[in-house]
Amino acid sequence: MTSWDGGTVDEREYLIVRGTVQQIVYYNDENGYAVLRLAAENGAEVTATGTFPNIGLGEEVILTGCWVTHPTYGEQFATEAFERRLPTSVRGIAEYLGSGLIRGIGPRLAAKIAEKFGEDTFDILMHEPERLSELRGITDRKAKEIGRQFTEQSEMRLLMDFLSEHGLPVALTPLLYKRLHDSAIDALCENPYLLCDPYYDVDFKLADGLAMELGLSLLSDERVDAGILYTLTFNLNNGHTFIPVEKLLYAVCMLLSDDDVVVDEDRALHGIARLEEKGRLVREHIAGRDAVYLRDMHDAEAYLAEMLGYMAERNYEYDFDVDELLSALLESSEFTFSEKQQLAISTAARNGLVILTGGPGTGKTTTVRGILQVFEALGLDTLLAAPTGRAAKRLSDLTGMEAKTIHRLLEAGFAGGGRTVFARSVTNPLECDAVILDEVSMVDITLMQALINALPHGARLVLVGDADQLPPVGPGNFLRDLITSHRVPTIQLTEIFRQAQQSDIVMNAHAVNAGEMPRPSGADGDFFIMKRADPASVIETVAQLCAQRLPKHYGFTPAQIQVLSPAKRHGSGTIPLNRRLQEALNPPSESKLEKRFGDTIFREGDRVMQVRNNYDIVWEKQGDDEQGTGVFNGDVGEIIRIFPQQECMVIRFDDRIATYTFDMLNELELAYAVTVHKSQGSEFDAVVLALSDGLPRKLLTRNILYTAITRAKRLLVIVGSQDVVAYMVNNNQKGRRYSALKARLRLAETQ
């Protein structure tokens, strides 16, 4: 069964096993780790473990490794390296082709192809696929498609082997192949730092490791330039639109230097100048800083300052008495408006740009309804939008009008290389007279640039949001910069209306925002604190609340309850919470299929969240013929069916049904628990907030607590440490964001 190559490593004998893959017991799609059952050359069955990217049934393999004894599973062959050989026997070829590798070839057709062409099968698939049409039932078109798929699979397997050999995630394969096709390996060998492109989301050190393995110079211009671009791009995720040059130089030199290699500031400055000359960067003195921008960020910020300043100065004249119209409308309205609400409605009628801000219970929604009534009376065609699907649905429910996400409004799509493009733009503007945009605190400057670019000339824009909530995940602090620039007419609603005063959720949200401790409700209230400290106790209490106590005592279904946490991994973060909640709310069952992907098990009935924008996913409306494309970051759905043979699953997002292939599962996370950041823009009947010890201090801030509280409509339960709650209330630090939008708006006013 085995032979060995005559050497030892670390006192272990390294042996060689040759065999054919009979069963794939376990496969991790993210890193290619697998447990295989092999039929060895002498007929014995071998269990092998190791990294086998894109391994298929029927493949002949040569494994190098050693025997180990697993405490549960017994003797296994731990593989250190392997070579693959395509099968040469008719049976092996049929098994390989019929394993689901190629869409349209099942076991029967695979057997026919193998029998017809024998050991020449793979050569024909690669070079003469049209010959497949010699078989009954295969058209010329199908033959070419089978050949295309086989060629693509072969090229992707080579790429996977290259990535695996160099310790890079094999999950990069489809991304690299989609952009670079069969030239991916050559491109990586020429410039490993292309992996630092945000499209691939690879840590710089991994790309650096590949460069060192390939023998490239660690003082090369390519490495320095890549380090600068990586640092600037990485800091977009921290909300910065630029970085002061002195901080950039320090960060780049730290990134690129070690005990053996020193990259000094002079070399980094030359890199900045080089990239500026190529048009990749902009260096500018603004807001009292020597600022370095990525070109796109600079252009977005400058464009917004120019356009918003222009819109803020635009006033509308009418050939009738607007005050009389407003007075008549407000008197006849079913709503009663405060003086500030009336001021907001009047300002929106007269100005090209207006901001409406305020906390919970201050009447923002009622004011929006009043603005809509006035816009209708003025004959304006108005569109409603919000950053996320849930926020758009909530806006639609509250106003009775259709509301779309910004991406849907602008008809977003993908260009080559994964770039987002919008069909609506200055050359194809929106068909409207006004846009009302809700939850503006979530919107970063790049998305805002796209919206402003798509507004028709003369259109009004009403921005609605709570400036005390979390800033956007992306670059900039758009809403706060606009308000503090004092360039844009802003109405801040501060009066808490009587009905809202009856809610302890609303009153405690305002208390926290003012730096005061929240007060738990009495027995019939809507705000409770359950004191627990250690993560295990918090997580178990949360699971009991969701599975038993809240459904039993309040009648909430699990779908009406959302668990929130400030963090993902630490303490009572969403990852350990989701594992326990899945176990409590959707345990394994013979009637439910499941798919393991990395460390996550996806099961029929699971609640999941899309964690990146995907403009290509096709969806159908339930009970309707309507079709569309695109599922976006933050969309929450339920897995309704898993199809192992077809390697796909079907997910329902509200009234839309979408199919995900298994190689797309890196875009999904379990969503029984989500971070407070991910929850922004949504409201839930019941919120359970997990605040154990051990959460990262940088996430224990007042505005995170305030944002979490304001997600709850009918019930909020904090399960956690009193000390953590107190720390968050007293911690009013807001992370510094380097942005010059406010400075540009003020500068434009003086010119």
List the predicted regions and their residue ranges.
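Pre-P-loop entry segment of helicase/translocase ATPase cores
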Residues: 164, 233-237, 280-343
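Conserved helicase motor core of P-loop NTPases
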Residues: 467-629, 640
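C-terminal accessory regions
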Residues: 622, 633-751
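Short aromatic-glycine-enriched beta-strand elements
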Residues: 27-38, 645-650
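Accessory alpha-helical DNA-binding modules that contact the DNA backbone or grooves
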Residues: 12, 33-41, 47-48, 56-288, ...
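ASCE P-loop NTPase helicase motor core
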Residues: 242, 342-345, 350-524
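Structural detector for short beta-strands of small beta-barrel domains
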Residues: 13-28, 65, 636-640
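Loop/turn positions that initiate beta-strands
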Residues: 58-60, 605, 634
